[in-house]
Amino acid sequence: MLSPKRTRFRKQHRGRMKGVSYRGNRICFGRYALQALEPAWITSRQIEAGRRAISRYARRGGKIWVRIFPDKPVTLRPAETRMGSGKGSPEYWVSVVKPDRILYEMGGVSETVARAAMEIAARKMPIRTKFVIAE
């Protein structure tokens, strides 16, 4: 699973997901991509599940680029704990994804293979996505 090697602070505020993504919204490396249509937190497990799904379907052919990285810690307090006594401990990492953000890119395969692989990866995501092709 993806996670930062070290961070400046252990815990973060939740923040808000306003507007669309102006960075990371163009295809840079491959020919085909999966683009987010909704805002969401995507966990490192979901990113890894999507990456595995694409690589399993494509087998040896092609190359995959994961364009998002989980750099936000999400804290949870233990079950059946009373309120108060500080913020919970960091449990997992998420990537803050806004609409139009490219999640995965693929190259070196045919469009039919890429479309099918991205469709499987899209099923692993908690948001609606679309398949895009570089101009």
Swiss-Prot record:
Domain of life: Eukaryota
InterPro entries noted in UniProt: Ribosomal_uL16, Ribosomal_uL16_bact-type, Ribosomal_uL16_CS, Ribosomal_uL16_dom, Ribosomal_uL16_sf
UniProt entry tagged with the keyword Isomerase: no
Molecular functions per Gene Ontology: rRNA binding; structural constituent of ribosome
Gene Ontology terms: biological process: mitochondrial translation
Compartments it resides in: Plastid, Chloroplast
HAMAP family: Ribosomal_uL16
Oligomer and partners: Part of the 50S ribosomal subunit.
Family: Belongs to the universal ribosomal protein uL16 family.
Name of the protein in its database record: Large ribosomal subunit protein uL16c
Organism: Nymphaea alba (White water-lily)
Lineage: Eukaryota, Viridiplantae, Streptophyta, Embryophyta, Tracheophyta
